């Protein structure tokens, strides 16, 4: 498992055409790789993100992340076709957690989206630790320094 947070506004803007950190959303780029001989069911996996203060960041569904982006940018009136197009493009980046990792499907790549504890903009978070539970073995990864 490899994980990298997108911490800069520029990266977020370029990739998603939206400033996710300003909306209080931290996108985590993930890669899950199949390395065992037995298929690994990942749809029951639980992803938890905590900062150095012990506060838990909320995992957002793509739909919730989109609503948060729209709300944070005060977008209340929009062309329905434009929103559908944005949703389609945004969800194309989401990691597939529904299909198991197996010999025929060895890699899953994409993003998970976490909201800051107070819905405030993401500003150089310290001591971020990602914990993945309900896998054959739990995984803990330090993402940022304390």
Predicted regions and their residues:
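Conserved functional micro-motifs across diverse proteins
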Residues: 1-146
């Amino acid at each position: 498992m490899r994980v990298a947070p997108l911490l800069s506004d520029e990266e977020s803007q370029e990739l998603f055409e939206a400033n996710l950190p300003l909306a209080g959303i931290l996108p985590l780029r993930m890669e899950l790789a199949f390395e065992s001989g037995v298929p690994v069911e990942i749809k029951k996996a639980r992803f938890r993100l905590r900062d150095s203060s012990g506060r838990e960041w909320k995992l957002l569904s793509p739909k919730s992340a989109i609503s948060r982006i729209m709300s944070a940018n005060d977008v209340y009136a929009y062309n329905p076709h434009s929103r559908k197009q944005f949703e389609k493009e945004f969800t194309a980046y989401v990691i597939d957690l529904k299909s198991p990792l197996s010999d025929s499907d060895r890699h899953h790549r994409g993003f998970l989206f976490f909201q800051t504890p107070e819905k405030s903009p993401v500003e150089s978070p310290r001591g971020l630790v990602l914990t993945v539970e309900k896998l054959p073995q739990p995984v803990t990864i330090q993402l940022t320094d304390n």
